[in-house]
Amino acid sequence: MNSQQCVIIAIAGASASGKSLIAKTIFDELRRDLGTDQIGVINEDAYYRDQSHLSMDERVLTNYDHPKALDHQLLCTHLQLLKSGEAVDIPCYSYTEHTRTADTVTMTPKKVIILEGILLLTDPKLRELMDASVFMDTPLDICFLRRLTRDVAERGRTMESVISQYKKTVRPMFLQFIEPSKQYADIIVPRGGKNRIATDILKTRIQHLLAK
């Protein structure tokens, strides 16, 4: 598979803005046409830096909403390898341990790769690899309520810790890094991941890129 046959789509926006939902919708609908082995999803969270050398007390103090918390260079390298036809081993990140695990997930080359993550559009080198990009423009208060519910139910967090993190880093970093990166998006999606018109537009764009 050569680089011209690999379409990379990025879905960015605040935490809990609907990125995963629209990514799953696109994945489920396109795999019927392309086949499951020809489309893949990469979550930016997998590229949080390894913190196994730090104590748990130190790990919880990390600002996970700052671009420096992520190894975007490794993500760029993996995308370049996938575009050139090589498989990669994607790290696995533990939200409860706040570091990578010893496991990896192997991804083989795909016709379509969907990236999803909060800070994807902040990195110029990543943007150069994208064929199309989306920003989920969901109101921040709605994102916070969704995040609070999700992190307590699915990620072993306490309500107090989620609220504290939101005040200290999530909201400030959104305003400093994530929201300004909206200017680089090709498509801005209001009303979250259930926006059917936006989903259809993105699917059409992917199909057009594949037909080139």
From Swiss-Prot:
Pfam families: PRK (PF00485). Its EC number is 2.7.1.48. ATP binds at G13, A14, S15, A16, S17, G18, K19, S20. Keywords: ATP-binding, Cytoplasm, Kinase, Nucleotide-binding, Transferase. It catalyses: uridine + ATP = UMP + ADP + H(+); cytidine + ATP = CMP + ADP + H(+). InterPro entries: P-loop_NTPase, PRK/URK, Uridine_kinase, Uridine_kinase-like. HAMAP family: Uridine_kinase. Belongs to the uridine kinase family. This is Uridine kinase.
